[in-house]
Amino acid sequence: MREHNAVISGFDPYDGVGVNPAVEVPKAIAEQGLGVSSAPDDPLEQVAVTVHAVSIPVSFAKAWPTLKETIEATKPNIVIATGLKHAARGVMLERCATNLMDAIKPDADN
């Protein structure tokens, strides 16, 4: 059996978002596991995936150190970062990301 480690991150609740699904979904996946069926053609049948959920503070100063600590502790094969976009009407994949610290609202430290 192949074993894989995954880290899935989501942001803590913030102003205007009392419960952030971007952190609740990773927590649920970590607790419940991935739904592997007993069908012989299930691609996850011979794969054990351990999911580590990490809640990221809404803070420019603390977000990366929190995620980095989890990555170093768990040594994942994959890291999936999630977020909440109010205008989205479902699950969306980012086509590109910009490493730019800009926000309309202040972060948790301000």
Predicted regions and their residues:
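N-terminal catalytic or cofactor-binding beta/alpha core of small enzyme domains
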Residues: 1-110
